[in-house]
Amino acid sequence: MARLIPNVEIDRIYPISEQKVARALVEQLPQDCVIYHSYPWLHSNTHSGNPPQKTLYEGEIDFVILWPEHGLLVLEVKGGKIDYREEERDWYSTNQQGETNRIKDPFAQASKNIYAIKKLLEKKQYSSQNIPFTYGYAVCFSGSRYRGGVPPGSEPSIILDMNHLPKIKSSLQSIFNHWNHASSQRSITPADRKKVDQILLPEFKLIPVLSSQIEDQEADLVRMSEDQLHILDMVKSNSRMAIE
């Protein structure tokens, strides 16, 4: 059974489309796998100018799958009835109430998200070398069955649907093989696993500085003195008051 981060009950995951995928991943993948759900990212790009300008970009990834034996995979999930309209090159989702809304291209989202993870890994650890393990992305339509041709920017080998959920382990193994550009599978070594864990889930600490602690203590003393003066005033005005 894989480990889910954050450590929440799967029944509390929303939307249901992601809950189904989370359950399949946690129950079927091995114990050394880590599944990051709703992983947020933020990175900056520098644009030319005088002076150069930095712009922040943000996003959220449905699932980041860290499987040491095979690599790292970003998984974008779409639920409900999904349609791609070729003449418009747009994607649409229809909910249970029959309401249809245009949505973002899931393959473009997944591609953008793996690029963000790649940039994060390169910035923190792998700036002077290629990332030494397999990484890629896939899209899962957890409430639909896939049929027909594939839209531009996609590939059958990185598409999952509801039929893949009962066998998601073997399906993901196949996807990793398609993203592997080396002659043999590039797994994540224990050393790299430690680095990736520290990058994706860094330890965040706030340590009070001494001057701040002194200021807090002085403020407490002032409050105590004010309280004591207030009590003395009350005692003076009420001779029958007792203080324990």
Language-model features: where?
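Glycine-rich phosphate-binding P-loop
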Residues: Q228-L229, I243
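Intrinsically disordered, low-complexity Ser/Thr/Pro/Gly-rich regulatory segments
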Residues: M1-R223, L229, M234
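Walker A/P-loop
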Residues: S237-E244
